[in-house]
């Protein structure tokens, strides 16, 4: 027993003292009493074994050696089991520091977790600049070789990110009533991305009654934490804007033709025309994946936010607006013929032949074959501009022109004209429905729940159309509407619980989109002139 008594205290003090010197029993008693008196932390609950030791210590039938050994035993056991923080591996501690850096940098932890998994699986990734810079400090070879799935640090980081994301979600759910989770998620259109997929899930229905659907817009639902929702929406908007601005900057530095990119993106979004391979590769190189799966609604795709930012950037570069389109520059062959005509020693037959050749070369083939239907104003068709969009533009430049005449002015094959005419008329049939739509006041649309921002009042943070440009009720060329996810009959006003989220857009652009593909851009249900009044709401001052 004396040998056991000497080993117990000696082992304990050699483990915890920093000077490496053993201490006496008196020092042990005094230090133990001082530490217990000065410690600000409460001791942990006693385990059953420790409670048994305390009862044994209170027994008077113990020898001095046995009592000393029992007093040292709990300390030795406690010293052999340090707290969880002390047992953390270096990789776990480094992963914790990485998460803290990401939080301080405003990174989207859920996106980082997903992209980190993609890197380890050799799949495509899209980090923001902040996320990439932080990760490169700890994974310097990530751009060249990726991250091995056997990396201890990467797996620790994924686990820590998963825990943090779950904690954040639990905090949000505890602060927001579950009753309002469905109706509030996705209702504020801060940007064109980040919509909750539960709004697009078939079969989800509201439990509200028919009387609730006939109530006016509730701008302040009870129990909704507006401040938290506003901060979360602003964080999503800033994160998306940072990614988009970084992509635009890199594309500009790489010399990509932004006008051509805007036109190609417009055709891709409006009619799913394939992007040119070089532009598709350029977008993928900056983290923008242009592929739109069939199961994903159009409004959920980040390429829409990029398209809106691209339109804003190019609009700010324009020095003049509504300027008439200039004719194309004369070709070198045409310039040579004109110089030849100015030379005096030409025979009359030669001069007539050159003049006739110039007239034929100056006129497009469509004009030579369709001189009878030549329009007064007919600019050339832009690159990647489809026939429907070009015909609508020609009709706007030539008021009063019949649709068939407009199409015949640039489509030489009579067999190919009818389909274009039908698509244009389908788009034009939707436009008159604007005056028949149910209305939402601008004040209600600008509420925290709906989040509309007129470009005239918010030039730096305006709401963008689903198909690109910024929206304003003062713009005479726009018909601003809010398109709901779920339909309701015409007499009923907008109800957030029944109609779900609103996506703001220009009805003219929507009509052009529906002419080629009559599908609801949010849920892919059929949408045409017959049922658009069940989904759309006109925004009025």
From Swiss-Prot:
GO cellular component: extracellular region
Region (Disordered): 1-94, 168-222, 317-338
Induction: Transcriptionally induced by HrpL.
Single biological process term from Gene Ontology: symbiont-mediated perturbation of host programmed cell death
Listed Basic and acidic residues bias regions: 18-31
Cited InterPro entries: E3_ubiquit_lig_AvrPtoB, HopAB_BAK-bd, HopAB_BAK-bd_sf, HopAB_E3_ubiquit_lig_sf, HopAB_PID
Keywords carried by this UniProt record: Hypersensitive response elicitation, Secreted, Virulence
Localization annotation: Secreted
TM regions (residue ranges): none
Low complexity composition bias: residue spans: 183-196
Pfam families found in the cross-reference section: AvrPtoB-E3_ubiq, AvrPtoB_bdg
Primary site of residence: secreted
Role played: Effector protein that plays different roles depending on the species and plant cultivars that interact with the pathogen. Acts as a virulence determinant by enhancing the development of disease symptoms and bacterial growth. Acts as an avirulence factor by eliciting hypersensitive response (HR) and plant resistance.
Family named by the database record: Belongs to the HopAB family.
Protein name in UniProt: Effector protein hopAB1
Species, as recorded: Pseudomonas savastanoi
Designated gene of the protein: hopAB1
